[in-house]
Amino acid sequence: MVDVVELKYVKKFLAKSAVHTLNYYDITFITEGKGAFSVDNQTYEAIPRDVLFSKPGEIRNWDTHHITNGYALIFEEEFLSFLFKDSLFVQHLSFFQIESSSSLLHLSDELYTRILETLHDIKMEIDSYQQGDVHVLRALLYEVLMLLDRAYLKMTSIEEGRSREVSNNHVRDR
């Protein structure tokens, strides 16, 4: 299973309570508005070009009044895992690892545009789906995951560099 859904459509089903738990992987792209978005009790102030990552079983909550639109790329692990020799492929992605430091990634304009175009391609492929023909869908999903993984690794290496700099400054100050 893989799908791309607009947040303004999903919001209708969350009207009574925005707190929910998913049983699939979800990568949410904020396109309009800004507001609080929580993943497993960690709250972020989400703005356009932000991406939020959720694993099955995590508790999510978002400000449906102020985050006005975006896209959710949802998929089950099985959709990809039997394609690769690594049955834990999805769990090995940097943003889905247990020890990942953040569920939030802010994209550059260029990457944001590229990924939104690919999400559009995924939606078109789903709409023209032929029974048993999932290879293009898998390839498009794989492309998005690899682009996000690269950006997430770059973000965390920059953050680690800043952390080491601050740590080194404290050592030098003594």
Predicted regions and their residues:
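Short, Lys/Arg-enriched, Trp-marked, Pro/Gly-tolerant hinge/linker segments that flank
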Residues: H106-D109, I126-L137, L148-R174
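Short beta-strand His + acidic residue motifs that chelate non-heme Fe in jelly-roll/DSBH
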Residues: A36-S38, S54, I59-H66
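A hydrophobic/aromatic-rich effector-binding and dimerization subdomain
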Residues: M1, D63-M124, R150, K154
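Short acidic-glycine-tyrosine-enriched beta hairpin
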Residues: N41-K55
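Amphipathic, well-ordered alpha-helical segments in soluble domains
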Residues: D26-F29, R114-T118, L140, V144-L147
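Residues immediately flanking
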Residues: E32, P56, F75-E77
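Generic protein-terminus/edge-of-domain signal
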Residues: M1-E45
